[in-house]
């Protein structure tokens, strides 16, 4: 048949099949580890679904919710198509306000600029609020290697810093940590009462511990939820007020943002602030929405605008909407895969649907294995407040895998085999006739490293007769006949 049909023959070493199969299941293996603690996995799933439910309740209380989503998407697409114009306008206004604006093309340049500023001012104690950009660029380890003490002031981030862990969620960084673990950590680090796991007590202990760190900081840093071109404002949204506390004492303050955070004006900002907290945590608005415009009297205010691969996305029409993201985390809260596998099962530092897309945009050869962590249920696309077509983009990235040389060899062989059979009815029917033999095979033959599909699923029993065979034997009856 192969000779007659002039079908291509590909020679593949068995080691290649095994290696690709193994590489393609990094997420599955990490998720398996997460699921070993069934109680924690169930709690993680239920907690995030509760946040999703709060988001739904809040969105239904705003009659113009869909109109806001459409407007936000339009504003983001406008901003992303006018980035140079808006960023230069921001620089002009921020400079007029007294800020010093820097541009960083990549993570290395960003880290170097921050260090240069701190080093010039002889800073050794540095406090910062939550910034996913700092995580993206590896700022903390970069500074600490050079003798600068970095303190995270966000409570969740501070807990993780003391535990030497990375965030597992972009809004709820310590969502995977139980209060009992926090109590034990604070007992060790802060001398709290043994066995006291009361959240209020632990929060007060953290507040007391952070107070002297705020007062003794020589410089402070914030990220940015938004940067307003028309005013030169940096806008930071928090529930703890830690960004305001951090910037209130030191004379030296730094803000940094990825260039996609730019919005045209304050009217546009109002659209996003109505969507952000409702989508992220189910609140009408964050407790604090702070505008930073100019340096303190006698101080300096530095603003760093970072590219780090963002401009490259502008040349990818299928994926440009990724730049719409406002980092609300709603896609993670709704994603059935993320909720049941945890943030550490992904290889990119941002997990969930948006992390899959950002990782592929940043380095597809490195992060392609995350593409398997999606069921294409489309829930992420449905809840995104700025209408990023997350699931559709994941599907498009999957289609690009073969061109990247990262398509799973085992799956390619299986798909090619199915195509071959389905184009030849006689062979297909013969395969169906032989299929029940699989039912009696030992498990190691059905579930192994060659079978990615079977790693998380049970193969159903093959029927002794196919529908086609039953039809030919008049065993199939319509509704009227069966009556």
Task: State what each model feature region is.
Residues 21-318:
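The feature marks the mature, well-folded catalytic cores of soluble enzymes
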């Amino acid at each position: 048949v192969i000779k007659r049909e002039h079908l291509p023959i590909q020679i593949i070493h068995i080691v290649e099949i095994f290696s690709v199969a193994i590489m393609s299941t990094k997420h599955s293996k990490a998720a398996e580890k997460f699921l070993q603690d069934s109680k924690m996995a169930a709690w993680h799933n239920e907690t995030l679904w509760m946040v999703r439910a709060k988001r739904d309740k809040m969105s239904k209380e705003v009659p113009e919710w869909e109109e806001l989503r459409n407007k936000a998407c339009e504003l983001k697409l406008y901003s992303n198509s006018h980035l140079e114009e808006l960023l230069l306008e921001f620089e002009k206004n921020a400079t007029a306000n007294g800020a010093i604006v820097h541009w960083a093309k990549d993570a290395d340049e960003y880290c170097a600029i921050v260090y240069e500023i701190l080093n010039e001012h002889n800073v050794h104690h540095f406090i910062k609020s939550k910034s996913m950009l700092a995580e993206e660029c590896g700022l903390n380890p970069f500074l600490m290697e050079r003798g600068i003490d970095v303190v995270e002031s966000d409570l969740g981030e501070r807990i993780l810093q003391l535990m030497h862990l990375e965030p597992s969620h972009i809004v709820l960084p310590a969502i995977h940590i139980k209060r009992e673990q926090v109590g034990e950590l604070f007992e060790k680090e802060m001398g709290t009462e043994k066995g006291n796991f009361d959240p209020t007590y632990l929060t007060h202990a953290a507040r007391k511990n952070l107070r002297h760190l705020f007062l003794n900081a020589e410089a402070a840093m914030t990220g940015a939820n938004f940067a307003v071109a028309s005013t030169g404002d940096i806008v930071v949204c928090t529930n703890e007020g830690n960004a305001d506390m951090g910037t209130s004492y030191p004379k030296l303050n730094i803000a940094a943002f990825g260039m996609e955070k730019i919005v045209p004006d304050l009217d546009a900002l109002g659209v996003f602030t109505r969507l952000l907290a409702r989508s992220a945590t189910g609140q009408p608005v964050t407790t604090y929405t702070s505008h930073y415009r100019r340096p303190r009297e006698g101080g300096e205010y530095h603003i760093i605008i970072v590219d780090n691969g963002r401009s490259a996305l502008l040349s990818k029409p299928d994926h440009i909407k990724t730049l719409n993201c406002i980092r609300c985390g709603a896609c993670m809260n709704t994603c059935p895969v993320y909720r049941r596998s945890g943030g550490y099962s992904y290889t990119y530092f941002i997990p969930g649907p948006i992390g899959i897309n950002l990782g592929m945009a940043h380095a597809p050869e490195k992060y392609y294995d995350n593409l398997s962590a999606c069921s294409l249920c489309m829930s992420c696309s449905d809840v995104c407040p700025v209408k990023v077509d997350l699931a559709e983009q994941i599907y498009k990235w999957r289609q690009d895998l073969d061109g990247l040389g990262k398509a799973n060899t085992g799956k390619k062989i299986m798909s090619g085999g199915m195509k071959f059979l389905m184009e030849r009815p006689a062979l297909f029917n013969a395969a169906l006739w032989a299929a029940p033999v699989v039912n009696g095979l030992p498990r190691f033959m059905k579930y192994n490293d060659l079978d990615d599909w079977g790693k998380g699923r049970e193969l159903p029993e093959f029927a002794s007769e196919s529908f086609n065979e039953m039809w030919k034997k008049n065993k199939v009856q319509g509704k009227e006949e069966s009556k």
